[in-house]
Amino acid sequence: MAAAAVSSLLAPSGSCYSPGCHSCWGPGPGGGRRLPSPRRRPITAAARPTWAVPRRSRLEWGRVEAQNSGARTSCRAALQWLSSTARSHVNVGYGSPLVFPGLTKPGSSRCLCVVGMVGNAGNQVGDDSDDGIKVTNEKLRAVIRKSKEVLEIHRNLLEKISASERKKITSIIEDSSIYNEQDPFGQRDSSFYHLDEVPDDDEFSYDLQMYLDRRPDQSEVVATQDYEAQLSQISEMGQSVAEGTSDDPSASAAVDLINIILVAAECAPWSKTGGLGDVAGALPKALARRGHRVMVVVPMYKNYAEPQQLGEPRRYQVAGQDMEVIYYHAYIDGVDFVFIDNPIFHHVENDIYGGDRTDILKRMVLLCKAAIEVPWYVPCGGYCYGDGNLVFLANDWHTALLPVYLKAYYHDNGFMIYARSVLVIHNIAHQGRGPLDDFSYLDLPVDYMDLFKLYDPFGGDHLNIFAAGIKAADRLLTVSHGYAWELKTAEGGWGLHGIINESDWKFQGIVNGIDTTDWNPRCDIHLKSDGYTNYSLETVQAGKQQCKAALQKELGLPVRGDVPVIAFIGRLDHQKGVDLIAEAMPWIAGQDVQLIMLGTGRQDLEDTLRRLESQHYDRVRGWVGFSIRLAHRMTAGADILLMPSRFEPCGLNQLYAMMYGTVPVVHAVGGLRDTVEHYNPYEESGLGWTFEKAEANRLIDALGHCLNTYRNYRTSWEGLQKRGMMQDLSWDNAAKLYEEVLLAAKYQW
């Protein structure tokens, strides 16, 4: 009985499931198939298995914990487990080649084969005695020790090699790992096998070539070097660099480079209504600095100066209508920006989320359908991204259809099976809700209706696009720890808390960063004219005074250096608490302050801005619309930033404000609670003021304390400014965490 059980585990007879063995089920990440889990729990980059059993096993496998390395599974732990449970029925032999991705030459080393006794006598090297097992274990330890030594040498070399040289090496390795029909997998003597190379003819994309730098001197790929020459080149480069660890942020990512395609409805500086546009414009650059190949796909709302047409036009059917898409491309700061052009996007240039429900839905359907095929049909830098090493990063409900399409159109039909999707929740309040009849616009099989159907106690069954995306995505993210907690509650989940709690195993929060090349008072291009000035931590007092005077002059306010300037920048809707400011306006108007508000959104709230300006013209300005230049200048010239949001997933404006020495007053919710520490006058700590309830009187109380400190305790005020400016708010920190999630999705099976 036991022999039969072990034999069924290890079928087919004589197979080897160690990393890089090509005679079994084919390589997964690291060579072998991934260990199945009853809950499909993902495997993080730091805990990736180096040994796994075949997926066709019907037994439920528990997780094998490795005590030393923290990995979920390892060769040693797995084989010890097998030894303890079926010692007399399993022997260890040496068989197929052990290939370490990008390092080990096929045939230069031998790998461990775990084989059943039945029908495998020719592969046995031990016997059922303790002596045989002891010899086997010694051989195991020797092979594992040698493997670890080789991999450690490789990692050390990568740490020493400069970023530019590493890119050259990666190009060499990547080129030699491209599969082609004339050279079947594993037949070339000189090939380097890449971590994610896939040998299946039907499933592998031929456009997997990775390019990391398009400069002519680095785009030439050497395809004819043999193994020894490549390894020698790596060693020479590593030895030519001084001892020490590289400070280059891509160093830690060099071993696990992936292709990332971020898809969003907006992207700064081309289109922006809120924080999503900033994230789409800045996060990809930080990921690219870590060595990954990164693309951003967004609609083309008008004619932009930078992009150029690339690739052939494609046609997609949306709601029964054929729509032609033209792809435009720009390469900026190491990132490919691809714009989806169709007349359906043009008429919403000034309000990208405008129009009726069905018009918006059609735009998002077209965006997702076109974006998911970009890695096949848009040869950025001459090479398509391909789908063998690919993770899509979708954002909010606008692109929540992408994980669903990836599954329905491709995975279910055997295509792009190694591509993964991650969905980021920026704002759960906007969900893409509609009647069930809207399902006809999505062009999906009828059996996918249940994925979208959600019951609302007030409206009955309805179609919910965000709900479907959350269920279909391989990983789920949101933009702060506080918001991640709120989304699991009935109050903060907006009806999706149940689905999010069910997906808790794949869900986490990562606090956003900011683009410190764009938002930086030292080099802000919007402060170089019209009387504004750049400034630093050392010159913040004089610099902000000059920017305040220039801002007052530009907007037609009295130029007074002693009056505190309060700014509000954001979308005009119920979430942002604009009505709380209006309710507190009688008190604010009596405080000898100037209030400047910038934003666009609901018509009634736009009218509120105009009304407040007309009623208090000597001290209030309400700018309806959005101007990136004015947003930068307001952040530099204001003393206080007001953010009374009822809920705020992360918020970026408070981060921009602190970077510029502007003190935030915020409602303690979501990411605002995570990023703005309440001021403590006794310990001289904190970054601003917070209030606990979204009520006008609480806003007045917090703002009153802030104004009192500004007028009467200048030393404390300057301390607040300096502490805010001294923080590291860059995207590089957040990008490391995003990278871990993307890799976890990539290795999820």
From Swiss-Prot:
It is an enzyme of class 2 (transferase). GO terms for molecular function: alpha-1,4-glucan glucosyltransferase (ADP-glucose donor) activity; alpha-1,4-glucan glucosyltransferase (UDP-glucose donor) activity. Its main location: plastid. Its EC number is 2.4.1.21. Keywords: Amyloplast, Chloroplast, Glycosyltransferase, Plastid, Starch biosynthesis, Transferase, Transit peptide. Residues 1-44 form a transit peptide. Signal peptide: none annotated. Expressed in endosperm, leaves, and weakly in roots. HAMAP family: Glycogen_synth. This is Soluble starch synthase 2-1, chloroplastic/amyloplastic. It comes from Oryza sativa subsp. japonica.
